Amino acid sequence: MEVDINGVNRTNNSVPSTTEGSSPSKPDPEKPRCSSTPCSPIRRTVSGYQILHMDANFLVGFTTGEELLKLAHKCATTEENPGESLPAFRSKQLESGLSRSSRIYKARGRQYQPYEIPAVNGRRRRRMPSSGDKCNKAVPYEPYKAVHGPLPLCLLKGKRAHSKSLDYLNLDKMNIKESADTEVLQYQLQHLTLRGDRVFARNNT
């Protein structure tokens, strides 16, 4: 019954083999002490599994767990195969714990960094379509639609870096004698400025 109490469900195969091999050499009072205290290196399998369980849950005590496993490997020399499988499993747990923690930090970097740093860029990108939306909302000037048609895409989308400049208007090539070109220029300048709506309405009347 003590073997059932001491052993974990995972260690059903390893615990009876340790008790069979070391029960004549070790007295009985050591079994509950080893099972109750995970730091005692007398029983390698039970203490090793308890340390693994603690590390898997709380991710603490990697060095102490390794030292205890080394001491347990020195103390219990009768069984070689479980001794080789346990440190391998322990190293797998250690690697999985480290990779899990690194994954957590990477996920934190993915979560916080893209939202903090490019917030200005996102705001800048949001600002340009908002001006485009204002342009679309302020389009109820029907005669100007009939004169020159829809606005150019660089004004509506605003994705280029030089979209706010007046280079795309081709001022040097424009004929000021034609009234339609001046109206197009005035209409485009209206939507480049915020207070152009009132100014353009005042100049038009």
Curated annotation (Swiss-Prot):
Principal location class: cytoplasm
Coiled-coil portions: none
Subunit structure comment from the entry: Interacts with unc119 family proteins; interaction preferentially takes place when unc119 proteins are unliganded with myristoylated proteins.
Pfam families in the record: UNC119_bdg (PF15435)
Protein's name according to its UniProt entry: Macrophage immunometabolism regulator
Biased composition (Polar residues): 8-25
Disordered as annotated region, ranges: 1-40
Stated family: Belongs to the UNC119-binding protein family.
Keywords from the named record: Cell projection, Cilium, Cilium biogenesis/degradation, Cytoplasm, Inflammatory response, Protein transport, Transport
Subcellular location: Cytoplasm; Cell projection, Cilium
Cellular component aspect of the GO annotation: ciliary transition zone; cytoplasm
Gene: macir
Record InterPro entries: UNC119-bd
Stated role: May play a role in immune regulation through regulation of the macrophage function. May also play a role in trafficking of proteins via its interaction with unc119 family cargo adapters. May play a role in ciliary membrane localization.
Gene Ontology BP, a term: negative regulation of inflammatory response
